[in-house]
From Swiss-Prot:
Substrate binds at S170. This is 11-beta-hydroxysteroid dehydrogenase 1. It is an enzyme of class 1 (oxidoreductase). Pathway: Steroid metabolism. Glycans are attached at N123, N162, N207. It comes from Saimiri sciureus. Controls the reversible conversion of biologically active glucocorticoids such as cortisone to cortisol, and 11-dehydrocorticosterone to corticosterone in the presence of NADP(H). Participates in the corticosteroid receptor-mediated anti-inflammatory response, as well as metabolic and homeostatic processes. Bidirectional in vitro, predominantly functions as a reductase in vivo, thereby increasing the concentration of active glucocorticoids. It has broad substrate specificity, besides glucocorticoids, it accepts other steroid and sterol substrates. It holds the Pfam family adh_short.
Length: 291
């Protein structure tokens, strides 16, 4: 008991103070001026809005999605908004070779990379699971595995720039919901994998931040169509959501929560988990590992 009072409680107090107050660093749009940013899934919805915000802030932007025609319009508008440069590379994230080559091409177009924003998903609809293994496999490959491939391809450039990785995920990656089992599984995988390698980067002194964005229902056309007649709740605005994601990435926050309900943030931002992670991390030794 005496040890807890004299050692453990002060440490936990300092940890909690850091956890809650470090997020209040001021964001300034000029932080993005001249930065080199990739945005995937950028032909519509949150991805497109992020590209537009980045353009207004004077960033270099490379966007990707499947639709060449739509991406051309996005790039044209980015240039009108003031992007330092804007390019598109069309392709599907079902193709891991494309995913890897896309990052290399984007890096050449911009002359490097400061921020990798991963936002794409495969098409999904709300329904009960009916033994569709193909859909589960496709969801895991596009929504999860391609994120890993893109990250691996981008890491050499991000290490040079001390850059940032931003993962756009979902409340469905932290709380189980019916009728989206494959989608939810892929989002749980994202949260587990990128939370884990964030710890590894810290332990190995890799100065690349990872921001996991946990989103509720957002008013994108895709989401509204999927939940129509099934889920009755108000959606948050995609324009504001996109800006909060960018802010979180620039400020190198570990997690961003965005939902119309304050309860979502309060209940999911779990300080006890952070304390447990901190305590567990003290028991690791990397002396015997071969890099």
């Amino acid at each position: 008991m005496a040890f807890m009072k004299t050692h453990l409680l002060p440490i936990l107090g300092l940890f909690m103070a850091y956890y809650y107050y470090s997020a209040y660093e001021e964001f300034r749009p000029e932080m993005l001026q001249g930065k080199k940013v990739i945005v995937t899934g950028a032909s519509k919805g949150i991805g497109r809005e992020m590209a537009y915000h980045l353009a207004k802030m004077g960033a270099h932007v490379v966007v990707t999605a499947r639709s060449k025609e739509t991406l051309q319009k996005v790039v044209s508008h980015c240039l009108e908004l003031g992007a330092a440069s804007a390019h598109y590379i069309a392709g599907t994230m079902e193709d891991m070779t494309f995913a890897e080559q896309f990052v290399a091409q984007a890096g050449k177009l911009m002359g490097g990379l400061d921020m990798l924003i991963l936002n794409h998903i495969t098409n999904t609809s709300l329904n009960f699971f009916h033994d569709d293994i193909h859909h589960v496999r496709k969801s895991m490959e596009v929504n999860f595995l391609s994120y890993v491939v893109l990250t691996v391809a981008a890491m050499p450039m991000l290490k040079q720039s001390n850059g940032s990785i931003v993962i756009v995920s979902s409340v469905a990656g932290k709380v189980a919901y019916p009728m989206i089992s494959a989608y939810s599984a892929s989002k749980f995988a994202l949260y587990g994998f990128f939370s884990s390698i964030r710890k590894e980067y810290l332990m190995s002194e890799v100065n690349v931040s990872i921001t996991l964005c946990v989103l509720g229902l957002i008013d994108t056309d895709t989401a509204m169509k999927a939940v129509s007649g099934i889920i009755k709740m108000q959606a948050a605005r995609k324009e504001e959501c996109a800006l909060e994601i960018i802010k979180g990435g620039v400020l190198r926050q570990e997690e961003v929560y965005y939902d119309r309900s304050l309860w979502t943030t309060l209940l999911l931002r779990n300080p006890s988990r952070k304390i447990l992670e901190f305590l567990r991390s003290t028991s690791y030794s990397t002396d015997g590992l071969i890099n």
